Amino acid sequence: MLNRKIYCFWVGHNNQEMNENRKAGLASLFVNSKVEVVLVDNDNLHSYIVDGHPLHEGFQYLSDVHKADYLRTYFMHHHGGGYSDIKPCNWDWNPYFDALENSLAYGIGAPEDEGELSVTPRQRPWLGQHWDKLMTNDLYIFKPYTVFTAKWYTKLLSIMDEKLEQLKQNPAKISREAADTYVTGYPIQWGEILLEIFHPLCYDYTDRLIKTMPYPITIDYR
């Protein structure tokens, strides 16, 4: 049985309160998605950690945005179910849970939009030519413990191992800190632990992904 929940993440160094746009986006998910929405924050995160699979030692040193990147990978592999950025939602998610549950696909999401393609510069020379095979990172539903999520999670842990000592020496101090946007010594680039893992997997397993969910609403959400 597919885990019929949507997980959202609001984690960080100081439990910063959401602004009004974020609160409105979250409220719209609660009302319009027609499934259970779970907001994972610093206070309840521990209750979702699976026995034998603790958060990586380096998690504590990540920027807030990278913590959310890490957690969506962790949750999609170990729990499955839905994920959404905290953005406005005006549709029922149940038909998409049904479609995935009644298929052999690994996941279902929204197709990437060529004009909005979030491909990092290191990916663009080849992956930007194949945007039609990709799903957006903003929202999706995955079955847990598939070959897709296993490769996704394993690659994440590999990068975390590689960067651990640098993270200890230069932990994030800014919510949206990344090596390619702030020159601070923080070692992880903006898309390094999500986009640069997720999109190549979408390309490799495009035939096992359903790309029929509505494209996320990206106006006035921050």
Model-derived features: where do they sit?
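Short acidic donor-binding loop at the edge of a beta-strand
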Residues: 79-82
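Glycosyltransferase-associated regions of secretory-pathway enzymes
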Residues: 1-69, 74, 84-222
